[in-house]
């Protein structure tokens, strides 16, 4: 499905990432963004304990980031993790939502959906406040959290696009 004025970002295979010993290369991921969204450098200072792999933003529409975290922090050592092995949607959002929004997610989850694409399961959440879509999946020995967020005005104006960005996330 090609959308006019949209482009696909795919994580380069040779992009560095991962920390410490025993890290395998990150399985690449991709997503679609409208024109005008650009990569924003990730500074070590803004990590705040989370493993942010990538940031994108559009000053008028919103911003997104990708967290790639080792599964072993949350589950027994899995080399071929699936999101289902980590837990059901409720367990996943309760455990990882705070990594994304910086606070407890209780009472903030508006909707939860499960989607299967190319044999991989994705959990999709909509939270507010803050306004955020989170898409979660697992691959290899990592958990992927894709977060698309915006302020109130951006959310109102660009809700459809923001949701489309969130739903376009794939681990390749």
Question: What are these model-derived regions, one by one?
Answer:
Residues 1-133, 138-172:
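N-terminal targeting sequences that direct proteins away from the cytosol to non-cytosolic compartments
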């Amino acid at each position: 499905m090609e959308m006019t004025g949209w482009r696909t970002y795919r994580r380069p295979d040779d992009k560095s990432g991962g920390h410490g010993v025993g890290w395998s290369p990150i399985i690449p991921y991709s997503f679609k963004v409208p024109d005008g969204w650009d990569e924003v450098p990730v500074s070590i200072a803004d990590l705040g304990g989370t493993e942010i792999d990538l940031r994108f933003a559009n000053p008028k529409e919103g911003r997104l980031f990708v967290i790639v975290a080792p599964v072993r922090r949350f589950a027994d050592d899995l080399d071929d993790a699936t999101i289902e092995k980590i837990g059901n949607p409720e367990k996943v959002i309760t455990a990882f939502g705070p990594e994304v929004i910086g606070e407890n997610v209780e009472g903030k989850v508006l909707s939860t959906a499960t989607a299967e694409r190319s044999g991989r399961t994705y959990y999709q959440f909509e939270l507010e406040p803050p306004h955020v879509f989170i898409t979660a999946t697992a691959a290899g020995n990592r958990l992927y959290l894709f977060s698309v967020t915006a302020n109130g005005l951006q959310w109102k104006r660009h809700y459809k696009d923001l949701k489309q960005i969130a739903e376009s996330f794939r681990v390749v």
